[in-house]
């Protein structure tokens, strides 16, 4: 998995994408099989790259910093290392970055205190619509603002220990708590704007560590954010994590889908 890690080199590789950065969900638990039917696995040239969210039969919402020159999409997956009869493979016919996302950030070796990493969103159009099944479903866009203190969770595939490069294979879940952006602002020198959400571990329940970029943040049962960035220290249960807030971007999401479907 990839994650926009603020203390690592963010220079572009030859493909025009961020270099692959391994990620972990530490101290969480294995999600119940197919309990997150909107969960998408975004691949680049046959390798797992990012998470994503199925928001329309033919559209996936993910993080802009997951940009690459080639995408493949898997839906209906739980264990990425096994063949599953619920799985659906899709090619991507086009990609659309949020026009407000600052692409120059991806060319920087280091991020600076004045950098604004808001609007970290990208829509991927599938070449063919997904088949909606028990294991593949759309996640509704939010209709209400999230509340501070909400119980949230996110999910993703990746490493589950700070001491190994072995992936979990199975989809992992972790519980978080939504907190004020001011708390993240004290932890991070980069700009915390009204376009992002800040969450931290709930009762030391686990860590997304380097995270699962592009995955959904679900708060009190409502889709509210897309996993975006944080620092790289793993299993630090004092860490705060930043998610792109979906509500302010609804107009762009809906218009992009309508105009390009």
From Swiss-Prot:
Where is each Peptidase S1 domain found? 25-258
Q: What is its EC number?
A: 3.4.21.35
Which PROSITE patterns does this entry report, sorted A to Z? Answer: TRYPSIN_DOM, TRYPSIN_HIS, TRYPSIN_SER
- InterPro entries, per this entry? Peptidase_S1_PA (IPR009003), Peptidase_S1_PA_chymotrypsin (IPR043504), Peptidase_S1A (IPR001314), Trypsin_dom (IPR001254), TRYPSIN_HIS (IPR018114), TRYPSIN_SER (IPR033116)
Q: Which GO terms describe its molecular function?
A: serine-type endopeptidase activity
Domain of life of the native organism? Eukaryota
- Per the UniProt entry, the disulfide pairs are 31-173, 50-66, 152-219, 184-198, 209-234
| CC annotations in GO | extracellular space; secretory granule
**Does the keyword Disulfide bond belong to this entry?**
yes
Family stated for the protein in its record: Belongs to the peptidase S1 family. Kallikrein subfamily.
Instruction: Please give the function described in this protein's UniProt entry.
Output: Glandular kallikreins cleave Met-Lys and Arg-Ser bonds in kininogen to release Lys-bradykinin.
The protein's name in its UniProt record:
Kallikrein-1E2
